[in-house]
Amino acid sequence: MKNLTGLCNLPAGDIHTLLDLAAVFKKRLVTPDPSFSVTLQNKRIALVFFENSTRTRFSFDIAARHLGGSTLSFSASGSSVSKGESLGDTIRNLEAMQVDAFVLRHASSGAADFIAGITAKTVINAGDGSHEHPTQALLDIFTLREHFGAVKGLNIVILGDVLHSRVARSNIFGLKTLGANVAVCGPATLLFSDTSHLGVSIFTDLDKAIEWADAALVLRLQLERATGGYLPSLEEYSTHFGLNDERLERVRKHLLVLHPGPINREIEISNNVADRIQPPGYSKSMLLEQVSNGVAVRMAVLQTLLAG
């Protein structure tokens, strides 16, 4: 494997290999091993982010440093992009500086595949438009696998703005490849018009979705949707699709809750549900566990692509 631009066509064996390696790295992060080799020494990794990021950018930075690599942080606002330089020219110039890999986030769907087509260096997609976000999905799947022991046969509902979500797409591809049952839930205006090619079920009633699901992946509601004609109001969305204690207690179903962040508290998810990591209650939040797992998963991706 040379690049990771998406999970759409990634075989189950490759996903399992990455998750198994991530499990090894997670143990080493908890219990440091002095014999652990820094396999990315002298490797330069460019973090090329054309969109804002906290978790993904810092996670890749920390992952690379754990493996002995060095990172170069790129900000579009402080670069020649602000003077009109194209994405392709930016990448070619960084490549000329002997960068070994590009971790790319861009607003345009397909940007990562475009870059992979013009450079001989490794390309990792850190989110491109509404297309894919493969490492986020891998860490979500890793979190589920750690909790349940396996992903195959699980019922996973993806809740919220599925239509515009790269996280949703990558999770659907990865979860389906590993044998999970996947459903989406949200207002009809924020769901796919046709899901036959994806093999997912559709719920427009959140209570029924919770009854069916073992875990819920709650997506960030992009607040501009309320003014873009997709939603009557944020209050209306929260009433019908917000995940809160009242709804969970009504259904009386214990649910594992994931969220890629950042969170719109009291809109897509309540404070109690977002922060609950111990009972009592009908849910368990994995939000911070996801963030921790992201470092190990991205270490596995970097190791596999650059030193494997």
Curated annotation (Swiss-Prot):
GO molecular function, one term: aspartate carbamoyltransferase activity
HAMAP family to which the protein is assigned, alphabetical: Asp_carb_tr
Gene3D superfamilies in the cross-refs: Aspartate/ornithine carbamoyltransferase (3.40.50.1370)
GO biological process: 'de novo' pyrimidine nucleobase biosynthetic process; 'de novo' UMP biosynthetic process; amino acid metabolic process
Keyword terms, alphabetized: Pyrimidine biosynthesis, Transferase
Broadest EC class assigned to this enzyme: transferase
NCBIfam families in the record: asp_carb_tr (TIGR00670), PRK00856.1 (NF002032)
UniProt-recorded name of the protein: Aspartate carbamoyltransferase catalytic subunit
Function statement: Catalyzes the condensation of carbamoyl phosphate and aspartate to form carbamoyl aspartate and inorganic phosphate, the committed step in the de novo pyrimidine nucleotide biosynthesis pathway.
Family annotation (InterPro entries): Asp/Orn_carbamoyltranf_P-bd, Asp/Orn_carbamoylTrfase, Asp/Orn_carbamoylTrfase_sf, Asp_carbamoyltransf, Asp_carbamoyltransf_Asp/Orn-bd
UniProt pathway annotation: Pyrimidine metabolism; UMP biosynthesis via de novo pathway; (S)-dihydroorotate from bicarbonate: step 2/3
